[in-house]
């Protein structure tokens, strides 16, 4: 089994790249999605988050992710507290899911905070998707984020240089979908498939 970390700054296009890898035959997991599951109502994580941050983060009985996001992206201490609750549970969920996969699987693990979480050693290979700030900002505005939210979230993440230093390969993604797909296909054929042959034993 080959476990590949896929990282990149917010708005870089990680999810597009993950989708293309899935179409080519990989199994894709999203750390953010696992993090949502980890704090769903009824979970241990939910109780810990509400105890830590108070009822102000609740909306109709569920955690308001936008409100929680505003808190953690403006307060580094709050961010660390949340990560201490969520990260171990995310790792547990991922390990459980891996048990059901074939031994020759290529697993793409979409993890925005690879550099920040110091978790590079959990992966066989790491790829970062990078875009210029203007392109990322434009994409995030299309998602409905306000300018101050975009600036705050970008500032809270590792720099491009830091992400690149943790990775084996960089995918530049500044707009052209066809070019991006061709890059992903090339990486699949020339890098990941050969690597999987040595990790699938």
Predicted regions and their residues:
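Small-molecule kinase domains that catalyze NTP-dependent phosphoryl transfer to phosphate-bearing small molecules
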Residues: 93, 120-122, 141-192, 200
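ATP-binding Walker
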Residues: 12
